[in-house]
Amino acid sequence: MRKIIHVDMDCFFAAVEMRDNPALRDIPIAIGGSRERRGVISTANYPARKFGVRSAMPTGMALKLCPHLTLLPGRFDAYKEASNHIREIFSRYTSRIEPLSLDEAYLDVTDSVHCHGSATLIAQEIRQTIFNELQLTASAGVAPVKFLAKIASDMNKPNGQFVITPAEVPAFLQTLPLAKIPGVGKVSAAKLEAMGLRTCGDVQKCDLVTLLKRFGKFGRILWERSQGIDERDVNSERLRKSVGVERTMAEDIHHWSECEAIIERLYPELERRLAKVKPDLLIARQGVKLKFDDFQQTTQEHVWPRLNKSDLIATARKTWDERRGGRGVRLVGLHVTLLDPQMERQLVLGL
């Protein structure tokens, strides 16, 4: 049985700012955007979250919720330095590390001899070491599979951890809301609820064929997760090549104004996800995806050095006009392709 830890730093960017400037600790702060121009919140500290300020929220909305919010532009070199230090701490316990972004990672400690092989104690020691060496707090989840470890890391935030032992998995899954499973969005959750499926326990009683007919490949993933099955390894060689966000509509759309409104809502989430992986927002390409009512889909992208909403909207409009052919659109997606590390080094040297 595997021992997987998911470590997630607590409001990481904001925490680095509060550590380096103690005057910020007890006031609402957020990273990203400014009062003078439009932007989105990358992360917010817990005092700001009490006012409803959240990641990917437009700055204007955040300021309405919390007029005295302190906005910081972000010091991404400092965040990267802290992230590298945290990664080095992980490596003291295992070589099997899969970074997901600057502030979270999976660790496979199945074969680790530290702390007498106890994943629970390893997670505690890692969190304490991070605090001792960086004065930053982390939350952790421990489980026999990746998706449960990720869910567990959110159970006792901030500065806590939650353990799901192999023996506890069946009972935990019985009442686990399907919306907690990574990949189950609002639209999918609504469709599942309409079928009477709210928890993993409900799905366990459902026929796999029914799920496959309704959800395709995702139906199998949903069925497996509800049984506690997740055979994905912690991949130390994992190199993220793209970042994307998409939305499947409850009803097909037929007007460009509807598509543009969806892009406006998707863009802040794309920006937030990209910032966690590439704080400087440098990219190789960006593009859009439309899936039509006949389940055919089309993708169009441009070479572009930095994430740019205006270009994405223009690309989407061109795709809408030239490729839709009067069909309804059931899905809208935005994505970016990240720079190859070697190419990125060459660009930096060229500067």
UniProtKB/Swiss-Prot annotation:
Q: Does the keyword Nucleotidyltransferase apply?
A: yes
Keywords from UniProt, A to Z, are: Cytoplasm, DNA damage, DNA repair, DNA replication, DNA-binding, DNA-directed DNA polymerase, Magnesium, Metal-binding, Mutator protein, Nucleotidyltransferase, Transferase
What exactly does this protein do?
A: Poorly processive, error-prone DNA polymerase involved in untargeted mutagenesis. Copies undamaged DNA at stalled replication forks, which arise in vivo from mismatched or misaligned primer ends. These misaligned primers can be extended by PolIV. Exhibits no 3'-5' exonuclease (proofreading) activity. May be involved in translesional synthesis, in conjunction with the beta clamp from PolIII.
Pfam families linked to this entry: IMS, IMS_C, IMS_HHH_1
* Subunit details: Monomer.
- UmuC domain location is 4-185
Q: What is the lineage of its organism?
A: Bacteria, Pseudomonadati, Pseudomonadota, Gammaproteobacteria, Enterobacterales
Write out the catalysed reaction: DNA(n) + a 2'-deoxyribonucleoside 5'-triphosphate = DNA(n+1) + diphosphate
Name the gene that codes for it. dinB
A molecular function (GO) held by this record is: damaged DNA binding
Residues given in the record as Mg(2+) binding sites: 8, 103
> What's the EC number here?
2.7.7.7
Q: How is the cofactor bound?
A: Binds 2 magnesium ions per subunit.
Keyword DNA damage assigned to the entry: answer is yes
- Tell me what this protein is called: DNA polymerase IV
